[in-house]
Amino acid sequence: MDILLNLINYSNNLKSQIKNNNNPENGSIVVLLSNISNDFEEIKDLQYKQQQQQQQNPNNIIKTFSNTIFKRIKHFISISINFGIKTIATKLLLIKKRKNITSSTSTSTCTTITIDKIINTILFENLNIIIKLLSLIEMIIIREYNYCKNTITQQQQQPILIWIGNSTNNNNKNKKIKIINLESIEKSINYLKTIKQQNKNTRIIIDNDIPLDHIKQLLSQFNNFPINIICFKNKCKNNEKEKKEEEEDHDHDHDDKKKEKEDKEKEEEEEEEDSNDDFEINDYITFLSIDFNNHFISLSNTEILYDYFINSMNYKPKFITTTTTTTTTTVNGSKNSSNTTTPITTKDDIDLDSDGEKKESDDDDDDDLTDEDTSQHNEIYSTSPKVSHSTFCQSSPTLLDLDLQQQQQQQQQQNDKIGGQQEKQITPNRSYTIRNMKPVSNQRYYSTPNKTVIINQQQQQQQQQQSSTSPSISPSSSNIKSEPNFARIDYKTSMFISNKPVAITTGKVATTQIHLRDALDNPVPTNLTSSNPSGFGPISSSPLHLTLLGPTNEILPFYCFVVGSGIFGISFFPTIHGIYTLSASLDYNNNNNNNNNNNNNSNNNNGIKKDLSIKNSPTIFKSTADGIISPNEIRSLHNSNEKKRKLPLLDFESTSNDSIDLLDFIIDSVDKNNNNNNNNNNNNNNNNNNNNNNNNNNNNNNNNNNNNNNNNNNNNNNNKENHNQNQNEIENENKNENENENENDKNGIIFINQNLNKEFNESSPEMSPTLQVEDDSNISAVNNDSSEIEATLAI
């Protein structure tokens, strides 16, 4: 809640920074950004008046004015990161800010030009969007506060947003904030007069198609009406032309004119690009998506979440290449091979004309926003991968290789004359690396003199289309080769770091960790986690199957990244209040070697696939507005998933602290079970002693169940006594070591009592029964503070 209150206070401070002098009184807040040039010219006049009165340097005024605004924007970005919003101004705003400050400081003689350059930057064009976004955030904050408050008071106070201007959509399905669309100022005035009570949860946003004169008429109606009004208009082109003509009349230097024209033309092009962005506003808004060169704003929706992760990567594969190699053998034994590569364009690179025909778009370097070097997209590379003979046959060049190369070059020249296309190859994703990469002038080919190579076309398309950059990719579809370390991973010791229901905050990114361990509780450093640094992502979750279910039982996407050697990090974005369950199970295909030993001890399985869920799966997350769960909710959530999680029941009567650790209750419950078990063991020992005494006294008080044992084993009574005593000591030691193990767990300790099986009694004393003990000592090593993990996505 502190972050939300800081966000409200910051929005009010930002609005007061650009507040007009004609604000109504009695607490109503009015922000006028109707015409950016006119509004900031008034600010410029005020600065000149202050400069004349105080006789200060105008450059200092410009610097102080720009620095305060930039500090506000940086503060807003930091708050928005904590709030879980991917905002604008990460690249455009800060980069343009540096350029404009250097230009303003260099031209210190002409103050009017420097102020215009500062005013007409993308910074001030984005201020209206930031203020509008803040007003929408305030409405969502009011709604969430009322939602939490209505659970007790059961009052309905719905926030209303009055949108004056043109709206694109009028859908009334499952939206969060009610929006009343009014096309003109007259309709809005008539509507506001019909409102009987002054609603504090009402906001007004005036769109850019309303003229300034009409806005002033609307302001006259709000003398005593506590409504937050956001007015914004973009720059008018007619006013710009008039200003250009006036400046051309006053200016005399032709060089200065050319520079000014070039600067203004660039600014106009940037403004036109920004003005093309459409705002999809509905009656009940769910999210606001503003596109500034792949920078998205998402507030609250589960459908936009997938695009939220995908578009943050800023990567689009332009081509998908399919390679087919055929080799023919003649009667004389000579081989003729041909290798053809055809690029297939994706949907992102194909546009539809008005006639319905497909038209290929131009390949601009600006479309590819990856961190990779763009030169590799314009060059042809040849690879020489060092792999086994199952994929490619690598050998030293021979005379036959040279003959094949010459034949292939001749065939390629003939194909080029006919109209063959030149090969163009692009790596399918950023995680795919090409080793031994070197540019050549010829086309890519593989020399295979001793073996015929046939590449499956469908298999290669699956490898390139289903890349590991998708955050919700499953390990079975990733086509990753099973490495030797996968056989070491054991589902009994691999675990989530959090073993109790975790409280998370709606609107913040929640993270957890998964540790891959073997049967001896040692970490398993896979190639993917050990070769990449911490924070690298997105990656595939192989060899784990991960599923994330939301409050409405829908499958949600998640983001998988590297935390350390053998440690996965899982992040997701909770957008609504409710319970999120993240479950993980071991991939059955990638762990066949490890499962063969376990299948022998599972009643032969009868052909049924065994449940390979890792420890603490599923992990439960409760998302609320304040990120707090009561102890009763923890107990109910824990007990509801007891069958799946194989954990004991909780007892909250012993403690009164709100910050409860699940390990305390596990230890307490196990101590109680151990006390009961010790009592049972003492009773068992007494019963065994009594039975042994009865056997030594010629079986005077034999039971019906032990007649056969006493008749067949009269000569081995002393050995059985010693064996039973040793067996009870082993049981007590194993029970004390496994305090966190439940008594009723199927994979837990097998308690051995006085009624042993007939097979064991008939066997020799050397063949002692084996104890199936699951090592659960990892749970005690978990840090208590690591259960509630909150992370933010870096912009």
Curated annotation (Swiss-Prot):
Keyword match Coiled coil = yes
User: Which GO cellular component terms, listed alphabetically, does the Swiss-Prot or TrEMBL entry include?
Assistant: mediator complex
Going by the UniProt record, its keywords in alphabetical order are: Coiled coil
Q: Mind listing the GO biological process terms from this record? A: positive regulation of transcription by RNA polymerase II
**Is Coiled coil given among the entry's keywords?**
yes
Where is this chain compositionally biased, Low complexity type? Answer: 326-345, 399-414, 455-480, 673-729
Acidic residues bias locations: 265-278, 362-373
Q: Could you tell me where the Basic and acidic residues compositional bias lies?
A: 251-264, 732-743
Biased composition (Polar residues) is annotated at 377-398
**Molecular function GO terms recorded:** transcription coactivator activity
- Disulfide bridge map: none
Name the coiled-coil region(s): 228-280
InterPro entries, per this entry?
A: Mediator_comp_sub12
Disordered, as annotated region? 242-278, 326-430, 455-484, 673-743
* Domain of life the protein comes from: Eukaryota
Name assigned to this protein: Putative uncharacterized protein DDB_G0285031
The species this protein belongs to is: Dictyostelium discoideum (Social amoeba)
